[in-house]
């Protein structure tokens, strides 16, 4: 498979060699990013958005790409992240397949795809690469750093590794470390990919592609991204119409099964399996406690920013709400004016993407007060 790069992407050439936290280095690597709004003369109105595992840098439409982005309702003129006021940057994570260098990219030294020769990937690598983009744009300090899901982890790594890089922070459905439940789910996702006979130790192609493994991995993910409450409301126990079923033993029968199948089928043609493995494992490894002798609150207290907001959904089972509470508590211990907000959204972990009616107002209020 090839990379899936949105039109209108911008690229930053990383320092070469680019050292990786867990060993190894990249040569002539790049980070894909997109921007909205205008940077003011003093370069003090910049906001950096760090996305989750699967999104690209196309958070919203712009002149070079009119397609709606994955955070279209949150970002733009007059929206909660108001691009009439803010210069907004969104990067595609290092290790992804959406424009930034990752396992699906070609190694300039060997002229072959990295595949499993790509160095072990950490959240900190994504943090360091993103800040190179910020500095290249002439920005010394961000007005705010926003991270959601995996991006919430990356944002915390940025704040730990690059003191004074931001005046404020919004952490949305993020965490300071992976919990056992989340690690277990991601372990099953990776196993589904690796056990697909077409995976071939990462050496697949379009003819022999681990579609079944990636499809199952995505289904597991989607189940954890939403909540049982939402599934009940949307699908109940409604069965498919007779023309939607087939005679396959134990095949699709319920609408929820068909939804998962359709969602997964779309995903496998837009994401590289090896990239999925690398990014997934990087989340398992991340732990703020490593920065304070095993004390996660002390690790968070090492972060020095003026203001912070941690937001979560009460129905999130992948990044449960106590993890956002923990972020706010740890930041307060370090002297940050940090606020925690738990929202009653039925849409689980994905609520920040789809429930803008609940998540938008607190983001807008926080940024308006800066």
Swiss-Prot record:
Signal peptide, first to last residue: none
Coiled-coil portions = none
Substrates-to-products reaction catalysed: succinyl-CoA + L-serine = O-succinyl-L-serine + CoA
Residue span(s) of domain AB hydrolase-1:
45-354
- Any keyword Glycoprotein? no
Residues at the site labelled Important for acyl-CoA specificity: 186
* Membrane-traversing stretches: none
Tell me the GO molecular function terms: homoserine O-acetyltransferase activity; L-serine O-succinyltransferase activity
What does the entry list as the binding residues for substrate? 218, 350
Please, one GO biological process term? homoserine metabolic process
Q: Which Gene3D superfamilies match?
A: 1.10.1740.110, alpha/beta hydrolase
> Which enzyme class, named as a word?
transferase
Region (Important for substrate specificity), start-end ranges: 52-55
Subunit structure and binding partners: Homodimer.
Family to which this protein belongs: Belongs to the AB hydrolase superfamily. MetX family.
Please identify the protein, giving its name as recorded: Serine O-succinyltransferase
Q: Which organism is it from?
A: Xylella fastidiosa (strain M12)
